[in-house]
Amino acid sequence: MAGGGHRPVVGTLHLLLLVAALPWASRGVSPSAAAWPEEKNYHQPAILNSSALRQIAEGTSISEMWRNDLQPLLIERYPGSPGSYAARQHIMQRIQRLQADWVLEIDTFLSQTPYGYRSFSNIISTLNPTAKRHLVLACHYDSKYFSHWDNRVFVGATDSAVPCAMMLELARALDKKLLSLKTVSDSKPDLSLQLIFFDGEEAFLHWSPQDSLYGSRHLAAKMASTPHPPGARGTSQLHGMDLLVLLDLIGAPNPMFPNFFPNSARWFERLQAIEHELHELGLLKDHSLERRYFQNYSYGGVIQDDHIPFLRRGVPILHLIPSPFPEVWHTMDDNEENLDESTIDNLNKILQVFVLEYLHL
C-alpha cells in the first residue's frame, strides 16, 4: 500500500473531486462521442435475490484461494526481484487456466528510481477488450523493499498479496458466469470486466511523487492516449472505465472501510447493502453489524494509492482500503500468521456479489 501512510492530500481533494465530477464534454469530448461514456452515470445494479446470494457464498472457497492463490504470493516481490517475476507468472497462470477467455496484456516499461532505472510490469486482464465499458478491479502485486532482518523478509500479506488473491478467487469462483459475457446473443456486450495488477506501487526509499505509483502512473498515461474503442476519435481507454475499484491493505481482522468519494457513494452504499443482506442470511462468518466493514462515514482526505493517477484524469473511484491501516502495516509482521481467514472470506463474498450485480449476471 499506500506508501503515503495516513498522509491525506487534503489540499488537492477539492480539485480532484471537481475534475472527477466534470462531464466529459467539458474535457474536450464531443457530445456525440460522450454519449456512451456518460452511460456509467446512470448505470444501475441488478439486485440479486437470496437464492443467488446463497449460491455465490457456496461457490467461493477460502481454503482453495489460500492454497492456490495466496500462499504462492507470500514472498518478497519488489520490482525487478526474482519474486516479482514469480508473482507475475503465478497471476498470469491462474488466469490463463480459466474458461472465461481473459485477454492478458503485460505493460512493461523502464522508469528512473532512487536505485537507477528499473523495469516494471503491470498485468492487465480483460474480458472482451472491445466492449465499450468495463468495471475495473485493481490492486498492486509488488511488495515494499526492506532489508532482511533476522532472516525475515517482508512479504506484504495485506499489502497486497491478499487483494491479489481475492481478485484471482473472484475470477475462478465466477468463471462460468463471466464466461456468459462472451457468449451472450449480442456478440459485443457493452459492459464487461477488467482486472489490473499494478507493479511498483511502493516507494523504494521515501514516498514522493517521483518515488511511488510507478505502474499506475505509467498505465494511466498510456490508457489516456489509447483510443477506445479502437480507432475512435475523442475517447480513450479511460473513458471506458465505468468505475475503478482499488483493493489495498486487506486481510487483517476488523477492517473499517470509509467512503472516500461522493461521486461513487451510491456504489459504496451498495457494498453496505450487500454486507447487510449476507449477514441477515447468515452467510458471513464471525461478523457483527455493530462492527460492519463498510462504515457510514466519509474520509476527510485522499490516501495516496494507485487510484490517484486515474482520479486526476476523471475516472470514478471506489477505494477499498481500511482506515485506520492494519497494525502490521509496513512491518515484518504483515505475514500469513496475522491474516484473518473469516474476514477475507466475508469480503470475497461481498465483492463477488457486487461484481455480479454491476455486470447484471
Regions found by a protein language model. Give the residues of each.
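Secretory-pathway/membrane protein signature
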Residues: 1-361
